[in-house]
Amino acid sequence: MVARISPGRVYAVGISLGSAVAAYLSKERPLAGVLLVTPFDSVEAIAKESYFWVPVGLLLRHRFPAAAFMTGNPTPAAVIAAAEDRVVKPPRTEALLAQLDNLVFQATLQDAGHETLYELPAYKTTLQAAFGALRDAASQAAHRRRDKSLPHPMIAAEHGSPGAAPDE
């Protein structure tokens, strides 16, 4: 079934820990876009910040390195953060943002926490705006791919390609 779905129609959405999973998916598969809500650079960085006296690097089996997954990743990305997030603090989101090569939308909702973000009326409109930006980016990318596959009119005319402008 996956083979029948055009990558230009698939978006990955990840919320909190799921943002690292969505980032990984966007690295491994061509996607139209990826939406990361309350994302972070890595679980290891969050753990080190909160438990600086513990050798978290030795204890973590899965580091969920979202920033590493997004480095050099051409997938259009949208990010929604919570200004009052106490789970994923702003420096962790900022570290991820610094690695995004194709950021098409970014919003930080004020008066929003990690768990309360979804209750705000602004969340729905922000989601809609994020998906709109991702859709626009995917559409532009599709046009660029299509334009690259078409021969330039002058080249087509020189080679007598079908549909080329006739010589005058």
Predicted feature descriptions by range:
Residues M1-R4:
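Alpha/beta-hydrolase active-site loop
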Residues P7-W53:
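Primarily recognizes the serine-hydrolase "nucleophile elbow" in alpha/beta-hydrolase
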Residues P55-F69, T75:
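Active-site nucleophile elbow and catalytic-triad environment of alpha/beta-hydrolase enzymes
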Residues A66, T75, K89-A98:
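Short alpha-helix in the alpha/beta-hydrolase fold that links the catalytic acid
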Residues E84-V88, H114-E115:
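Acidic catalytic loop of the alpha/beta-hydrolase fold
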